[in-house]
Curated annotation (Swiss-Prot):
Main location: membrane
SUPFAM superfamilies in UniProt: N-terminal domain of the delta subunit of the F1F0-ATP synthase (SSF47928)
Protein name: ATP synthase subunit delta
Organism whose genome encodes this protein: Metamycoplasma arthritidis (strain 158L3-1) (Mycoplasma arthritidis)
One cellular component term from this protein's GO annotations in UniProt: plasma membrane
Single GO MF descriptor: proton-transporting ATP synthase activity, rotational mechanism
Localization in the cell: Cell membrane
Family matches, as Pfam families: OSCP
């Protein structure tokens, strides 16, 4: 019996190592992110890839049809996962690959919480400013937080920037309680 965490790490690191050696890490990571989205929307697809009742040639044909626009290394990786009967772990493997890749590429993901939706231009402005501050490429997604009272809150890993009235009120409350 194998340890699932080891399996996920070994497969993801193998793909990372290949992409890094080939000099295609950034491009492959972008393709992997797209594939993860497709697989998350179509969980039944992984069941087919992992099924012993479906012929391997049929699985390979389905993989070619579904992912033909992606990097050939990624397509072959998915085929290998289907052949080795680890396709049921493909999402976890690919997510782990993205984590390893982002660490190497110095990419950080975060969330910008606001009271209203921000347009793409504003989000890009915040990404640019925070990227300079953290010395990393930052990618933000906007989420509405009704508990904020005006202002914004940005969270990237352990890094938090809060510039909102509710943030100031919480700080004031903490300082009053301490006294």
């Amino acid at each position: 019996m194998y340890n699932i965490n080891d399996l996920i790490y070994n497969w993801s690191f193998a793909l990372f190592d290949l992409a890094n050696d080939e000099g295609i890490l950034k491009e492959l990571t972008a393709d992997v992110v797209k594939v993860i989205k497709v697989l998350k929307r179509n969980k039944r697809y992984l069941e087919i890839l992992n099924s012993y009742n479906v012929d391997l040639d049929v699985k390979f044909q389905k993989i070619d049809e579904a992912f033909s626009g992606n990097n050939i290394h990624l397509i072959n990786f998915i085929k290998l996962a289907a052949k080795a009967a680890v396709a049921k772990f493909l999402i976890q493997i690919l997510v782990r690959f993205v984590e390893i890749s982002n660490q190497k590429l110095n990419v950080k993901y975060g969330t910008i919480f606001t009271t209203i939706a921000l347009d793409e231009v504003k989000v890009k402005e915040f990404e640019s400013k925070i990227s300079k501050k953290l010395n990393a490429k930052v990618i933000l997604k906007n989420e509405i937080d009704p508990s904020l009272i005006a202002g914004i809150k940005i969270k990237i890993d352990d890094y938090v920037v809060e510039n909102s009235i509710s943030g100031y009120l919480n700080e004031l409350k903490k300082s009053v309680i301490k006294k």
